[in-house]
A protein has these predicted regions:
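Conserved Rossmann-like nucleotide-cofactor binding loop
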Residues: 63
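Intrinsic, low-complexity N-terminal interaction/targeting segments
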Residues: 42, 48, 55, 66-79, ...
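Vicinal oxygen chelate
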Residues: 8-13, 17-25, 56-59, 78-146
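Short, small-residue-biased leader/transition segments that mark boundaries at the very start
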Residues: 1-2
Length: 146
């Protein structure tokens, strides 16, 4: 069998989908769509210096949409848009303990982009899993600030 439940295999506790990250080239225009047309509540905008990204967050109460715009030239988001265009950049899963998640993933030889948590938008501790390990999707794990 190729698939085992996480209880039998990794014991990684995923609390749910935290957000979907979308790379955009026009934050104001795209924000208008999510906020004014779809009427999703805008909760937060900030620049995350460590990632050179400006984030604008819309909360559906069952998951968030995080719009990502480069805040500096040569940022990861700018490169992504240049190479792949705008669109879904990553899926973020909330975990209860980011440090334990990193240990469990490394035990299973999962390739991480950063193996030490960084502070991301809204103060979450974050780590990214390389698309090589996920079937082509950039996955972010995030622990809510206490």
């Amino acid at each position: 069998m190729l698939f085992r439940s996480n209880q039998d295999y990794c014991k990684l506790k995923i609390l749910g989908i935290e957000h979907i990250g979308i790379a955009v080239d026009d934050l104001n225009k795209t924000s208008s769509f999510w906020g004014n047309i779809l009427n999703i509540l805008h909760t937060h905008t900030e620049v995350v210096e460590s990632e050179q990204v400006k984030t604008t967050i819309f909360d559906t109460k069952k998951g968030k949409i995080e719009l990502l715009s480069p805040s500096a030239s040569n940022s990861v988001i700018e490169k992504f848009i240049k190479n792949k265009g705008t669109g879904i950049h990553h899926v973020c899963l909330e975990v209860d303990d980011i440090s334990q998640a990193i240990i469990k993933l490394e035990e299973k030889n999962v390739v991480l982009i950063n193996n030490k948590p960084k502070i991301g938008a809204e103060g979450y501790k974050i780590v990214f899993i390389h698309p090589k390990s996920t079937g082509g999707v950039l996955v972010e794990l995030a622990e809510k600030p206490k």
